[in-house]
Regions:
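Residue-level detector of alpha-helix initiation sites
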Residues: 26, 190-191
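Conserved active-site-proximal phosphate/metal-binding subdomains
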Residues: 154-185, 191-332
Length: 332
């Protein structure tokens, strides 16, 4: 049995159990389709899309691929501080049902996905603790993404305050694998085939890579952001509420450190974005990476500029090389 013939791959309907993580604001239909056409699972980070925008994006992906792809939404309740900040989740879910999305994933909780599953979608939830993974399995998901502390972007924690959960993937993944019977996909700091092989060795059936695809040709990542990623060492990120009001891992730029150093509590999610987005936009316009609020994981320095299909091909080859070097038989 080949290393990629895992329960996760079968559940997701893909050749390779590699997920392009759904990074809201950076994923495009072109990126999702290119990854899926290469045999992995492309995705749309759709949390901030209106129902009409979501429908258009799904149809754009379908114009480019017949392969499975994933749509991701945020499952947290509308925040009291800004009740109309997000598009209504129930309206977004209605689009997911109507468009018969092949794979549906969610973050920050457990929505009512019964209609989505009845429409034929494979359901994927995000966990940062064993307790969350068990709750997801009890709710009926088909697979669990185990998000380690190394991961870029918002922490997916939903059963405890995110600041209390700092479990790295090396510790989290095998515990989640032991705790649930559904396939587990490892996430957090995975950038190349070595990381994928490590995830498989921990018992995961696949790996989710986000930061690694931010520099794909098809990603909506601006030049200043791309340069910043390549220059960010492993210690060059931090988890903070300074970006949005909710814990997220981002690069330690001057703009980030200035806000952290000011010592003022961030505004509640998502009102803090009213503070950071104008600074970020100005940094992009000035082509100044030091002014960006760049969500990224601890493996950012390992990014590579390439078309998404080439990245998938390289990841597969690297995984096979890593497994071969260890003399490991994944079917054993």
């Amino acid at each position: 049995m080949a290393w990629y013939e895992t329960p996760a791959a079968r559940a997701l309907g893909v050749r390779y159990p590699l997920l392009q993580a759904p990074m809201s604001g950076f994923t495009t239909p072109e990126l999702a389709a290119a990854v899926s056409n290469a045999g992995a699972l492309g995705s749309l980070g759709a949390a901030w899309l209106s129902p009409d925008e979501l429908r258009a994006a799904i149809r754009a992906v379908r114009q480019l691929t017949d392969a499975p792809f994933m749509v991701n939404l945020f499952a947290w309740p509308q925040p009291d501080a800004a009740p109309d900040a997000h598009p209504a989740l129930d309206e977004q879910l209605a689009v997911v049902v109507e468009e018969r999305v092949p794979v549906f994933s969610f973050t920050f909780g457990i929505p009512d996905f019964a209609e989505v599953k009845s429409a034929g979608a494979t359901i994927v939830g995000t966990a940062t603790t064993v307790a969350e993974a068990r709750a997801l399995e009890a709710a009926g998901v088909d697979a669990v993404v185990a998000q380690g502390w190394e991961a870029g972007g918002h922490r997916g924690t939903f059963e405890r305050p995110p600041a209390e959960v700092e479990v790295g993937g090396l510790a989290l993944v095998p515990q989640v694998v032991d705790a649930v019977s559904v396939p587990v996909v490892a996430a957090g700091g995975i950038m190349d085939g070595r990381g994928i092989a490590a995830a498989l060795a921990l018992g995961a059936g696949g790996a989710s890579l986000g930061t690694a695809f931010l520099t794909a040709s098809e990603a909506a990542t601006q030049p200043a952001f791309r340069r910043l990623l390549a220059q960010t060492p492993a210690e060059g990120t931090r988890v903070s509420r300074v970006y949005s009001g909710r814990e997220a891992r981002l690069v330690r730029t001057d703009a980030v450190e200035e806000l952290v150093g000011a010592g003022r509590p961030p505004a509640p999610y998502p009102l803090q974005l009213d503070v950071t987005r104008p600074i970020h936009r100005a940094g992009l316009q000035a082509d100044d990476p030091s002014r960006l609020f760049a969500l990224a994981g601890q493996g950012a320095a390992l990014v590579r500029e390439a078309p998404a299909a080439d990245l998938v091909e390289t990841l597969v080859a690297e995984t096979e090389k890593a497994i071969s070097r260890l003399g490991w038989d994944p079917s054993g």
